[in-house]
Amino acid sequence: MKILSYDIESTTGSHCDGSMCTFGYCLADENFNIIEQKDIVMRPNTRRYETKIKLHYEKAYIKAQPKFPEFYNEIKSLMASADYIIGFSVL
């Protein structure tokens, strides 16, 4: 059994405006042993960056990353391989 937990960070504080910049996840087995963990950092589809939001990565680093379509298949495969998915702050 595989359990996927993930969190999405955005540059604006909203997850529905194309500002997603990080998809961080942890994949664990049924005993909660970590199989894999990773931060997928991507350039958002917006130029807005809220100054009140403290991001884990520098703005220049985020802007230099590929956009979401480059990671879509990786994220889709990850989700398809999990038996349970737990998302934090996904709305």
Predicted regions, residues:
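Conserved non-catalytic scaffold segment of RNase H-like nuclease domains
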Residues: 2-4, 8-91
